[in-house]
From Swiss-Prot:
Compartment(s): Plastid, Chloroplast
Organism for this UniProt entry: Vitis vinifera (Grape)
Family annotation (Pfam families): Ycf15
Name of this protein: Putative uncharacterized protein ycf15
A cellular component annotation (GO) from this entry: chloroplast
InterPro entries for the chain: Uncharacterised_Ycf15 (IPR019645)
Primary gene name: ycf15-A
Length: 77
């Protein structure tokens, strides 16, 4: 599923509704495929067609990785 959010395209896994790649709108419209997308597909197999239990397992891993990342605000440091 593709969503347009704040001038960016977000690709979502329809089973989990987790966003897994954001792409500038113009880059998407120009049909350029950025390199990082293959990195994410390799890192999180939920992007491939696998059974729903596997999707859930990797979605939990992705959620844990995102939530465990330190939150910083570079504007006020």
């Amino acid at each position: 599923m593709l969503l347009l959010k704040h001038g960016r395209i977000e690709i979502l896994d329809q089973n989990t509704m987790y966003g897994w790649y954001k792409l500038p709108k113009q880059e998407f419209l120009n049909s350029e495929q950025p390199e990082p997308i293959t990195h994410y597909i390799k890192k999180f197999p939920l992007m491939k067609d696998v059974n729903p239990l596997e999707n859930q397992k990797y979605a939990c891993l992705m959620k844990w990785l995102l939530l465990s990342a330190p939150i910083t605000n570079h504007w006020f440091n």
